[in-house]
A protein has these predicted regions:
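Conserved non-catalytic scaffold segment of RNase H-like nuclease domains
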Residues: 1-138, 146, 173-187, 191, ...
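Short alpha-helix plus adjacent loop in nuclease-associated cores
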Residues: 153-174
Length: 242
């Protein structure tokens, strides 16, 4: 929607793709205002793992790490290690000295995340992924979503519908709309770099890309400001309407 302003960006890393069978091991989130200025009292100068990322308008950065069961740790996960750099062999919750806990068995972590998700729209790239994991792993999320307390904004359809650089080809029939490609086209990620595949770092380039993209669309009278645009936050939400 053309009035969207304060949003919470979020990205999760997991040990697989089935939310009923795998584990959330990394959650990164931060906030950004799409219209109003960055809060003057928000700490500045946050340092991301990728030193060339600049915090810019982002604030409230948070990175949360979680563990896996002993059996999962013993098997390891080479695919996830290669993709994210996270070695689940070091994250067994059964180790006496382990500081890691299972996210889906940690009520306080779930409550804290849900409270944040309810306070403003949350943004994710291919938000269906995050939404599916939250539905099964965050107590109260499904009820809150059904009651209309959750609004989800997805940058994937923004890329598909409104990014003119998303050109269909043989490899990408609907255009290349990965976060990596979208962020590069919107100037949020240098062409020589790659998406990091860590929650907070990926959240950051997503929000930077989204804000730049909205600025372009506004200036050109397209997207939310075009003929089919609408006021308000937009996004996807549930809840009864009378």
């Amino acid at each position: 929607g053309c009035d969207v302003d304060n949003v919470m960006g979020i990205d999760i890393e997991t040990t697989g793709t089935d939310p009923a069978r795998v584990y959330i091991i990394d959650v990164g989130f931060e906030y950004m205002n799409m219209i109003s200025p960055r809060p003057a009292d928000a700490p500045a100068g946050y340092q991301y793992e990728q030193g060339y990322y600049e915090a810019g308008d982002a604030y409230g950065q948070s990175r949360l790490a979680f563990g896996v069961p002993a059996e999962n740790a013993a098997l390891g996960n080479p695919l996830i290690l290669d993709l994210t750099g996270i070695d689940v062999r070091t994250r067994s919750v059964a180790e006496a000295a382990s500081s890691f806990r299972l996210f889906d068995e940690w009520p306080a972590a779930q409550i804290g995340l849900l409270q944040r998700l309810e306070q403003q729209p949350y943004v994710a790239h291919n938000a269906r992924f995050e939404h599916s994991f939250f539905m099964l792993n965050v107590a109260g999320y499904a009820e809150s979503y059904r009651a209309g307390k959750i609004t989800i904004i997805d940058t994937l359809p923004m890329s598909r519908r409104w990014d003119e650089g998303s050109i269909p080809d043989d490899e990408h029939p609907h255009g290349n709309n990965t976060l990596d490609a979208y962020a590069k086209r919107q100037g949020a990620l240098d062409a020589s770099k790659s998406e990091r595949h860590l929650g907070l770092e990926d959240t950051h380039i997503m929000l930077v890309a989204m804000k730049h993209h909205l600025g372009v669309l506004h200036a050109e009278g397209r997207g939310p400001w075009g003929a089919g645009g609408r006021p308000g936050n937009g996004g996807k939400r549930c809840g009864k309407r009378w």
